[in-house]
Amino acid sequence: MPYIIEVVQAGRTVEVMKYYSSRYGKKGIKRGERKALTKEEQIKVNKRAAEKKLRRLINENFQEGDTHLVLDYRKERRPAGRKEMREDADDFLREMRKLYKRHGIPLKYIHVMEIGKKGALHHHLVINTPEEISQQAIVRCWKGRGRTHHNPLDDTGQYAKLASYLIKQSDGMLRSPDALQGKRWNSSRNLRKPKVLRKEPVKDKGWYNRIARLPKKLEQSYYLDGDSVQEGIHEKTGYTFFTYTFIKNNQTWKETELEWEKL
């Protein structure tokens, strides 16, 4: 039966997803029971989609040497709620834009606010941090509200664990009484979007291939992220899906999109 293949490039990563859909002839393909989702199941589906979107956004726009920045508060400077936290973040980002502008560099960021179960308040940001921008200068932009924790991104180009962590930290914001439309993060407008290399139905007489494999010409330029391989049944459609990610290790190789047609 036909299945859908989706191939998305985000920075050094290429994500592959294969799944069945009722739009493309389900005869002969067994699926789980399709039913209305409970509130908890819908939250799980939405959370997984948000994590995928955030992972791709980080992978596309940030790299080794950039920073996962955490801002916390002194006890006497703690804001009363989400609105005040947002105002503090806006002020910090204004100061950061001024700082970067002085060096002729655009600021790129993703911002997540955290309200912990015990009331802890933090701001998480993923920011570009070129050599011209010092940690001390960033600290000054926070204006003594609390500490700043600087965590440099590694050289893998795959920041799935960071995206998962940030989505988890954003859960508290959705529980906040003044949460707006379940929005988990804000970002600068200058971020690039991941590139969809393929998204189309594939004619096949049986099940899709459950092997995460590369086109032969790309075997020396990419490697499989073993942690990314997942197979399951989508809660909403009842159909199976299979997904995995390759990471580029040869920065000089310039593949063409046609080579991804061979998956």
Regions found by a protein language model. Name each.
Residues 1-119, 129-263:
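Right-hand nucleic-acid polymerase module
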